[in-house]
Amino acid sequence: MSADRFVGAWRLLSLEARTSTGEVSYPYGQDPAGHLLYSREGYMSVSVMQARRVNFASDGLRAPAEEKLAAFDTYSSYSGRYEVRGQKVIHHVEISLFPNWTGKAQKRLFEFSGDHLTLTAPPVQIGGVEQNLVAIWQRLHSPEA
């Protein structure tokens, strides 16, 4: 498949963690927010967060450790080059909030349905349970001038 179908901006509709027994949880809550961008030049960027995050007590960037931890636990972001191979899109992470992903590849199975894109990650351990993260994105269209 051509990478052309990916190009553009996408808005996160849902992000679920699914177990092999069918249990579903919501790592960023049931109403997450996020954007996913794919460029024609072969770059991508994704940001996902829990909706209605709590503001820091002050407007300064230096915050207490508890506030920083809460901010980290409710937000994720990375970017880099991408390529399409068969039914997988591979994100080659160059920068990431989670430092362990920098320099690594994040592989996602993909499926298009109309203006929706579903990305499914390989199983990961969350809370000691193997789960697949499934994100559903909706293509954003340019606002009318």
Spans of features found by a protein language model:
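Lipid interaction determinants
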Residues: 1-77, 84-145
